[in-house]
Regions:
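A short glycine-rich, Lys/Arg-flanked "PGG" loop and its adjoining helix->strand segment in the class I
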Residues: 257-269
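Conserved beta-strand signature within the Rossmann-like core of class I S-adenosyl-L-methionine
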Residues: 270-278
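Conserved class I S-adenosyl-L-methionine
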Residues: 170-178
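Feature captures hydrophobic
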Residues: 1-155, 161
Length: 394
């Protein structure tokens, strides 16, 4: 009887906590009871198989709810993305005790630790990523020119768009920092006959990119290296163009200036640099659940802080573009592909991992849709370049 009474007390405390999220009405179900939160017809239902202690919700709302979902103690009845889209728009009401989460929220930005963090995500296995990415193996925001563009077409569009922005000419040298599986450099070599170098910390990406270079006979045009961006100045490289797509988020707030310093040292005077990154309106340490399970050490920079750092290296801004809704659509494609291949994925990973990954893709799509995060491309020059067209050429 005492246990039942205690459970009921914890249940009511939990419901009282959830009553702060009233922007969209929803149902909360427990084993023997249900509660209607907000006014109007419920837009989704959260089914709790176990009560989450109030202390856990107060310490980190996202961690408590995210881990409950991973364990199967929490289920969403209906469409996961739609529920998250309603709920995550209210992330400002989440509780986060940063001092109690120091190890998760503020991990070391040392070389050794960052290499470990990057490989923990990107070295899960190429076979896994091939199941839900498109044929290009692009793990970044696509660019949907037409409403009915496929994911593959959107990724081709994105790379074409970036290469046009870089104003490439035959024989130029191009560095890709965080080159992934190499699609951008392969396209640049084929279409513009540039000489490209890609650097990555991921052994899986390195091996696959090397295989692709040989497969397509591009050994005279492309090289890939396992390298930390901090080692670039030591190599005495000089490039006409530099690009970095979806890598800045791994650099860490303490290293933004160092990252840009390294780019400045290897970019020729007047050279173009395109920086493509997830951003936020304001500086924030990040989400505890994402930092613990998906991107350890990852931090989303604000647009304004990157612009401030750029000035220190005499980078002149040519253009800034926001592709937020393109990333929302990209993630929804990934999430659908992930679900369509769930039977194959079950042979690779356990249920908890698969629930975690599904939650990650759906939650990220929802945060982009709600403008909690953005996707920016900044096109800049090292110093002044008066030889470029006066109007946009892309």
């Amino acid at each position: 009887m005492f246990e039942t009474l205690q459970e009921k007390t914890e249940e009511k405390a939990m419901v009282q906590f959830l009553e702060r999220f009233t922007d969209y009405p929803f149902l909360v179900k427990f084993k023997n009871s249900e509660y209607h939160i907000g006014e109007g017809e419920p837009t989704f239902t959260v089914n709790f198989k176990k009560v989450i202690p109030l202390a856990d919700l107060m310490k980190s709302t996202s961690l408590a709810l995210g881990e409950a979902y991973m364990r199967g103690d929490l289920d969403i009845e209906g469409n996961l993305y739609e529920a998250l889209d309603h709920f995550l728009g209210q992330m400002g009401k989440f509780s986060t005790n940063e001092s109690a989460l120091k190890k998760i929220m503020f991990s070391s930005t040392s070389r050794k630790n960052q290499e470990k963090e990057v490989t923990s995500h990107y070295d899960i296995g190429n076979d896994f990523y091939k199941l839900w990415l498109d044929e290009t193996m692009s793990y970044s925001c696509g660019y949907f020119i037409h409403e009915d563009d496929t994911l593959y077409q959107a990724q081709v569009n994105k790379v074409d768009y970036i290469l046009k922005k870089l104003h490439l000419k035959e024989g130029m040298s191009l560095l890709d920092i965080g080159c992934g599986w190499g699609f951008l450099l392969i396209e640049a070599a084929k279409k513009y006959k540039i000489h490209g170098t890609g650097i990555t910390l991921s052994h899986e990406q390195y091996a696959e990119f090397q295989r692709r270079i040989k497969e397509q006979g591009l050994e005279d045009y492309l090289t890939v290296e396992l390298m930390d961006y901090r080692d670039l100045p030591k190599k005495e490289y000089q490039f006409d163009r530099v690009v970095s797509v979806g890598m800045l988020e791994h650099v860490g707030r303490d290293n933004y200036q160092l990252f840009l310093d390294c780019v400045e040292k290897v970019l020729k005077p007047g050279g173009l640099f395109l920086l493509h990154f997830i951003s936020a309106l304001k500086e924030h340490p990040g989400d505890p659940w994402v930092k613990k399970y998906i991107f350890p050490g990852g931090t989303v920079p604000s647009l304004r802080e990157i612009l401030n750092h750029m000035a220190e290296d005499n980078f002149h801004t040519l253009d800034i573009e926001n592709l937020r809704l393109h990333y929302n659509k990209t993630l929804l494609h990934w999430e659908k592909n992930f679900r369509d291949n769930i039977e194959k994925e079950k042979t690779m990973f356990d249920e908890e991992f698969l629930r975690m990954w599904d939650l990650y893709l759906s939650a990220c799509a929802a945060t982009f849709h709600n403008g909690i995060i953005d996707l920016h491309q900044i096109l800049m020059t090292k110093g002044v370049n008066n030889d470029l067209p006066m109007t946009r050429w892309y």
